[in-house]
Design a protein with these regions (language model features):
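Extended catalytic/binding region for NAD+/ADP-ribose chemistry, centered on the ART fold
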Residues: 1-15, 87-95
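Short helix-loop boundary/capping segments at the starts of domains
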Residues: 14-22
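Active-site and NAD+-binding cores of ADP-ribose-processing enzymes
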Residues: 21-119
Length: 119
């Protein structure tokens, strides 16, 4: 999840494996709602030159948060876009079941996103 639609789009694009026959035509954008009493923890990722290249460090912070079950949601900085945040959901947290998808919108990818890659 991301705090913005643009952030979610970029995060999804970075994980796509593209070729001419398999590039996606559309995606589903979901709006998530959580009750006000559900705390969102901000994970203190050390931001420096190396943090994006050291996934073991950031994964360790995420694993520790997940296993601790302190909060149902955690806010983490995007490794792709500066000043952009992603939100992690801990499905094992007791309050996780209170978080709901309230709207889903199907949208077409703009073909210009893929033209420079020859797909």
């Amino acid at each position: 999840m991301a705090e913005s639609a643009a952030g979610a789009l970029v995060e999804s694009l970075v994980h796509l494996e593209l070729n001419e026959r398999s590039w996606p035509r559309s995606y589903d954008l979901m709006q998530i709602a959580a009750p006000d009493q559900i705390e969102i923890e901000t994970l203190n990722v050390p931001v420096g030159d190396d943090w994006k290249r050291l996934p073991i460090m950031t994964r360790g912070l995420g694993d520790e948060w997940l296993n601790s079950k302190r909060t149902a949601l955690a806010r983490v900085p995007s490794a792709i876009l500066p000043n952009t945040w992603n939100v992690l959901l801990n499905p094992e947290h007791l309050a996780g079941g209170q978080i709901r998808v309230i709207e889903t919108t199907r949208a077409d990818y703009d073909p210009r996103l893929f033209q420079k890659f020859g797909v």
